From Swiss-Prot:
Protein name stated in the entry: Deubiquitinase OTUD6B
Residue ranges, annotated region (His-loop): 270-280
Lineage per the UniProt record: Eukaryota, Metazoa, Chordata, Craniata, Vertebrata
Protein purpose: Deubiquitinating enzyme that may play a role in the ubiquitin-dependent regulation of different cellular processes.
One Pfam family of this chain: OTU
Keyword Metal-binding listed: no
Domain of life per record: Eukaryota
Amino acid sequence: MDVAEENSEEALLIKQQRKEKKEVQAKIQCMKNSVPKNDKKRRKQMTEDIAKLEAEVEARHKEELEALAQKPTEPTQVSSITNGVTSLDLGSEEPVQQPRVSKAQKRREKKAAQEKERDDRIAEAEIANLSGARHLESQKLAQILAERELQIRQIPSDGHCMYRAIEHQLNEQGNSLTVANLRSQTADYMQKRAEDFLPFLTNSSTGDMYTQEEFQKYCTDIVNTPAWGGQLELRALSHILKTPIEVIQAESLPIVIGEEYSNKPITLVYMRHAYGLGEHYNSVEQLDTSTENS
C-alpha cells in the first residue's frame, strides 16, 4: 500500500476504528477487574453492559463505513470523520483509569476486600471445624443412622426446622399437612390444654412460671412467627398426629414422645452444634448406597 492509499479516508477510518476497538477492550477489561467474582448480580449486569457496548460500537463502525462508501472523497471529510471518531469518549486513558481512582471504585474495592477476608475466615473456620464439635456430632449421627439404613435429610435453619422436618416425613407418608398447618394445630392444642404446658414454661428474666398472658403470646408466636419448636411442641404434635416422635441425638439415647401410639414413628435428628447457631432439627431418609456400590 502506497502513501496515498494509507492516507485515504477508508484506510484512516479503519485504522481509527481498530484503535478504538483496542481502547474499548481495555475499558472492558477494567470493568471486569472492578467487579468481584463472587458478586453474581453485579457481574451479570456488567456482562450485559459489555455486550451492549460492543454491539453499539460494532453497529456504529458499520454505519461509518457505509456512510463513507456513499460519499465522494474529499479531504475535509477525512478530518470530519476522524475528528468525530476521536471525540467519542469510549476508551480514552481517562475513563480506563477512572474506575481505579474514583471514590466509588475505592468503595467497591474495599467491599470486595472485606468479602474476601470474610470468605477466608469462613474457609479457615470450616477447616478448624473438622476437629470441632459440629463435625464430631455429624459423624456420630451419621454412624447411628447408618445402622438403621438411614441418613440425614438436611432441613433449612430458619426457625421452622422442627416443623419442616415433620412436614417432610408426613409428606413421605402421603400426608399433605404443611408447616403452617402444624404450627396452627400445635398452638390450638396447647391453648386448650394450658395446664399441661404452663408448668414447663418460665420467664427467662424472672424465673417465674409464665402468666396466662405470657402463655397466650407464646402460643400466638407459634402461629405467627418462625419461633423455634422444642419438646413441648413435639409433645403436642405427637398427640395431634397420634404418632410417636423419635428424636435421635449424638450424645445420648433416642427420646421417644408419644409411645402410647402405634403408628409408624416420625424420626427427627436433633443437632446441638449445627451451623454454629445452636440447636437444630433435621429429618431422615433412606440411606443412599449408590455411591458405595458404584
